[in-house]
Amino acid sequence: MFFELFKKECAQTGKSLIYWFYVLCLLLFFFTQMGNPGFDSQRKPVKGEEDTYGMVTSTDKDVIMEQTLGILGQNLYYDEWSTYPAGFVKYVSLSSREKEEIWNILGECTGLASEELREKIDTEMESDKQAEGYLDAYMQPLILEPSDTLSYDEFQEKMERICQILGPGSDFEKSSYEQGYPVPATYEEAMEEYNSFLYDDKITGGYARLFGDYMGIALGILPVFLVVTRELRDRRAGMEELIYTRTASSGKVVLSRWLSMNFMMILPVLLASFYTLFQCAAYARGLEVSVDYLAFMPVVLGWLLPEILIVSALGMFLTNLSSSPLAILVQGIWWFGDVFAGSNTGLATGDFGLHLVLRFNSTGGRQTFLDHFSQLTANRIFYFLLAMILLVLTVIVYREKRKGRWDFRGKIRSYRKRKSEA
């Protein structure tokens, strides 16, 4: 019975125009972002061409202090403060007293008097604006050297006070700044990164991460349109009452529909991953190195599939509960806020938190990714379990509507009909 329901639901999904709209949008996004990788991001370093070496993450204490203090000075200059509790952005407004206290802390860390410190920050920021433009100056980190007498322990104590002022989830938490900061790579470091890309990641590992990054953006919003349309289609076709009287249990009906839609939605993702895999294999043959032909499968099934599951589960629950396209609005707000927050925390830092859309926009950074892999795993398990909870709630709502309960729109229509007849 269940397998028959599953096959019928797959067939219905395949006949749906909105499904092919989903496939078209997904593949269009894929081809515009990764259709032609080019493989320029990982070229063999040439000695003497420092501009081509790229960046590496440094956890040197001096680098951590000067860049963290620079971020603090930059925030003071723009008077813009944001934190990321639970992975979501929160804008903080500070009082004049709190900002003055932060100025004093920064002065103690740099050993500069208040006026000298303010003048130094103003001069460097204005100079960057003139040289790079406002946006580039904003993105370019300010560097403030710590005082010669400032120890790392004292620096940490000062940052703890900053965290008390701003609240949880700021850039000044130990767990944040000790992840390190990007610095220009040396030739030796660039060669190490290149060899890791070829022989540890085997080329496909790096591009699988990039694939997950790009496809995750689209999959954070597109599935909800298919789910909502499929759920509302029966109401528009006047089939709701017939469906509610089926002999199959509510759990089987809901589960078969949910699984069939997720199965159909993951298929184009798999096809797109094969396309990139074959491109990587062709590139590897030219370099005479081997590739990992299974590198994309963990990304598709462990990174992207849980995202589809939670988006579809939320869409089914809200649509069954409200009998309206409310889920599109809710998912749209969540998706937009999450993508924006994820971009602000860095595109390849491994700071996954509780983000729906996981960002790691780099074919390199293998070690950084591995260092944060447990965080990614916890994130995807959390959303998988949340999807299961929403699925159970959907079954409950569906079952109650089968019994004629919770049909708020039907009751409203009946009330209006009785009122018009009176």
Which role does the model predict for each range below?
Residues M1-L26, K403-S414:
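Aromatic- and glycine-rich beta-strand/loop motifs that create alpha-glucan
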Residues E4-E9, G14, M215, V228-L267:
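Helix-loop-helix units of permease transmembrane domains in multi-pass membrane transporters
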Residues W20-V23, M297-G302, I328-Q331, R380-I381:
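Hydrophobic alpha-helical transmembrane segments
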Residues C25-A86, K90, R161-L222, L255-S324:
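Secretory targeting signals
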Residues N36-E132, E192-Y199, I203, L326, ...:
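Terminal transmembrane helical anchor/hairpin motif
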Residues N104-A208:
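Transport-system extracytoplasmic interface segments
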Residues Y138-D153, E231-I243, E307-Q331:
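Cytoplasmic juxtamembrane interface segments
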Residues V224, P306-A313, Y383-T394:
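Hydrophobic cores of alpha-helical transmembrane segments in multi-pass inner/ER membrane proteins
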